[in-house]
Amino acid sequence: MKLLLASGLASLVLMSPAMAENMLRVSYPEDPKTADVQMTTDAYTLPLNVFDRLIESETTGPGQSALVPGLAEKWEVSADGLTYTFHLRDGVKFHDGAVLTADDVVYTFDRMLNPATKALNTDILTFIAGAQDRLDGKADSVSGLKAVDEHTVQITLTQPYAAFLALLASPGASIYNRAFTEAAGDQFGLTPETTNGTGPFILRDYTLNDSQMLEANDDYWRGRPKLDRLLIRVVTDSETLRMLFESDELDVFDLDYAPTQTPYFYGSDQWKAQVRSGPRVGMYYYNINQAKKPFDDVRVRKAFQMSIDRQTILDKNFYGKGKLEDGVMPRGLACYAAATPIEYNPTKAKELLAEAGYPDGVEITLQQASNWSQRWSDMNQIIQAQVAEAGFKANIVTSDEAAFMAARKVGDSDNYTQVWSADFNDPDNFFYTFFSESGTKVRAYNNNDPEVFAAIDKARGMTDQEARCKLYQDLTSRIVDTDAAWVPLFSLDHSYVVQSRVKNFTVPWNGWSDMSYYKVEVE
């Protein structure tokens, strides 16, 4: 990693607003460590600004997106849903001046699947024919990847997968230049000198655990960004973050990194008009393990659903900034439709427990890992008190995370609460993850419903999107209402506060903190 003197960017950081006229200053609590998206699963700001993808997921409104052409100006899908043909834009250049070719695309995806790379997000490509053999070291290339000519890429899948285009719009599918990346070797993405993309910004400086400086790409194929520079600072402390923002040394304040500041900014006469908010396409939920008594009885599961006052948790723990969710798909996800509301009714829940053979109540375990943040413990304590009214005598058990994950992997953990955010905009990201035959076990739901398994597998290959959405909506009712397989809690809003000179700042469709700053302007 190239380490610059701390003073190297200090003068830029402390610039007056006038001097920093065309520079946007943002912050994140951790250093990304690399710009190589194949080597990270949770730091996407550099990849989203330095690289492009064949297809992009463009925000069209709060919690809304559309798949639009990226490096591929158009594409076709064969009638059987197996072959995707992408036609690349002519004349797209990498930051070093090299012209994008089909070979770069094939190389990028092959590099991800090459076991020597040890990439962390190979799952987005495993539907490609030959991908698993490449990952397993049984092949030297991927049979389903082909450069037809200089501007045409053909990708063949092992089976139809309706979400494949959405996967290609995820950050992990960023495209690299073969010659540059091979020359950089294992240093690729670690320094400005070893980073090269086609994106709207060029990585110019990188001070480990301090900051990254990006400059506008004058030759960007979509047109030069409005910003001249993008300064990304690493700020670990929430009080320091607020001080920097209110002293005009940062242009954007991400309330996800300082949630206790939410009442202040929403109530401040100075700042409340500068709040920008959008839904996070994700869901807090409570797991129910049907392999363990008393939750093998659907009446007990329904009672548990009805005994949790979700609105109170949202209000107490998250200042009410969100929306109750009642299904499997959170708002903003493709195919989303409002599900049947889950009633909060501890009296009826108590009756259901009695019907199930527990007239005097029943003991249950709520599990959490020792290194999880305080919010999970806070939520469990609230839920422990709430469900007691219905007759659930909940014991909160804290275990080592490794032990918890090992037990969950074989379907043996106790009930727990967690959150899942959309990696890509397709229902499969939720349904397959939690309720497929493999997913329901490794996440310890054990909702062994063959009708659900068959429907999820069918939906993955459907090409009629309207019919596919209808199937997912019917599945929601089956999973949440009929099987009572989990407790959907709520989705949150993601709020930012921006300086008044910041224009065209839009919360990404998925509500992530990581975003492209291509369209943002400063006055």
Where do the protein language model's features map onto the residues?
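Gly/Pro-rich hinge or "lid" segments in bacterial periplasmic/extracellular proteins
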Residues: 58-62, 139, 150-151, 157-225, ...
